[in-house]
Regions:
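...captures the hydrophobic TM-helix bundle architecture rather than a specific catalytic motif
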Residues: 1-158
Length: 158
């Protein structure tokens, strides 16, 4: 995944430098693009959920900055605001899953969580409105909601 992200980022930077060659704000644009790449690399190389979360939030922030690059254009402002609102929906899923994850595992480290997942799966389920939901399934559901929000899927796109 690391090689893929670096390769695609290289191609995007190369294309952007040619496309934006005459723009007086190319330095700002390439800074935003590099920031996006940095946070994406942080996201995919994370060793724990805290680092993953910081990368996740950074990707959202840098996406907003890139979408709103030409901030004097009304449509760019509207699109950026819409993107940040949709991202907030996804972030709710991540926030909530991390809260439950720490409650169940007492750790954010991937290794600890992956070693304990079978034990937590066997624990008593969480009862919500008389429905018994397994703790791991509950966490995975909200992580999935976070991914849906970040990629603007299932009713969050227009």
């Amino acid at each position: 995944m690391l090689v893929l992200v670096v390769f695609v980022s290289f191609l995007v930077h190369l294309y952007s430098m040619d496309y934006m060659a005459g723009d007086p704000h190319i330095i700002r644009f390439l800074g935003y693009l590099s920031l996006f790449t940095f946070f994406m690399l942080m996201l995919i190389t994370a060793g724990n959920f805290v680092q993953l979360f910081l990368g996740w939030e950074g990707v959202g922030l840098s996406s907003y900055l890139l979408i709103n690059f030409w901030y004097t254009r009304v449509q760019a402002n509207k699109s950026a605001m819409k993107a940040i609102i949709v991202n907030r929906f996804g972030d709710f899923g991540i926030y909530f899953s991390l809260l439950v994850l720490f409650f169940c595992f007492k750790s954010f480290d991937f290794g600890v969580i992956f070693n304990l997942v079978d034990l937590v799966y066997l624990q008593s389920p969480i009862n919500i409105f008389n429905f018994a939901i397994n703790r791991v399934d509950f966490i995975v559901f909200f992580l999935f909601l976070g991914a849906i929000g970040k990629s603007a899927q299932l009713g969050l796109h227009t």
